[in-house]
């Protein structure tokens, strides 16, 4: 497209406006066009907002069950990953003993994983909502649940 100058400016502007408004009217007047989609989205959002008020339950037991399931799933994933790391550490340590080299003496071991699991489950049950309606807050979770790395040579977690 050539640069706009005094002679071609008007014709380029005219054709640009003609094509733009033609396509704009064609798209917007179509029932499935842009305006049709926006109408559908507005209606969908209204229906979801009305339905969302009836779906959300204010039953404290259901919320407590959801929190318990979430925490237990997290603990099971953590325990599974710690178990895999522990198995890997044992395999590498056996290879090191066969070669008379300790490859992971400074790497650490995950022998306290069962103690961690007991501690986390105890803290979850301790900070779960009581009959007074107190819910688990981020402050309680931060103070009660901690990830602990057991360095090689330390005892069990107490």
Curated annotation (Swiss-Prot):
Transmembrane portions of the chain: 7-27
Gene Ontology cellular-component terms listed: mitochondrial membrane; mitochondrion; plant-type vacuole; proton-transporting ATP synthase complex
InterPro entries attached to this UniProt entry: YMF19, YMF19-like, YMF19-like_N
Location relative to the cell: Mitochondrion membrane
GO MF: ATP binding; cobalt ion binding
Membrane topology per record: Single-pass membrane protein
EC number: 7.1.2.2
GO biological process: ATP biosynthetic process; proton transmembrane transport
Keywords for the protein's UniProt record, in alphabetical order: ATP synthesis, ATP-binding, CF(0), Hydrogen ion transport, Ion transport, Membrane, Mitochondrion, Nucleotide-binding, Translocase, Transmembrane, Transmembrane helix, Transport
Main localization, broad class: mitochondrion
Protein function: This is one of the chains of the nonenzymatic component (CF(0) subunit) of the mitochondrial ATPase complex.
Family: Belongs to the ATPase protein YMF19 family.
Subunit structure and binding partners: F-type ATPases have 2 components, CF(1) - the catalytic core - and CF(0) - the membrane proton channel. CF(1) has five subunits: alpha(3), beta(3), gamma(1), delta(1), epsilon(1). CF(0) has three main subunits: a, b and c.
Record's miscellaneous remark: A stretch of 270 kb of the mitochondrial genome is duplicated within the centromere of chromosome 2 resulting in the duplication of the gene. The expression of this duplicated gene (At2g07707) is demonstrated.
Designated name of the protein: ATP synthase protein YMF19
Species whose genome carries this gene: Arabidopsis thaliana (Mouse-ear cress)
């Amino acid at each position: 497209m050539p640069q706009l100058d005094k002679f071609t400016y008007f014709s380029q502007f005219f054709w640009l406006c003609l094509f733009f408004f033609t396509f704009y009217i064609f798209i917007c007047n179509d029932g499935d066009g842009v305006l049709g989609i926006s109408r559908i989205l507005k209606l969908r959002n209204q229906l979801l907002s009305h339905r969302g008020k009836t779906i959300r339950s204010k039953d404290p037991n259901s919320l407590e069950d959801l929190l318990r399931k979430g925490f237990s799933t997290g603990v099971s994933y953590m325990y599974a990953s710690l178990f895999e790391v522990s198995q890997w550490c044992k395999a590498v340590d056996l290879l090191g003993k066969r070669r008379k080299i300790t490859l992971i003496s400074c790497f650490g071991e995950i022998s306290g994983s069962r103690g961690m699991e007991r501690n986390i489950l105890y803290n979850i049950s301790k900070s779960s909502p009581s009959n007074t309606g107190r819910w688990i807050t981020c402050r309680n979770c931060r103070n009660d649940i901690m990830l602990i790395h057991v360095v090689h040579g330390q005892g069990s977690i107490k």
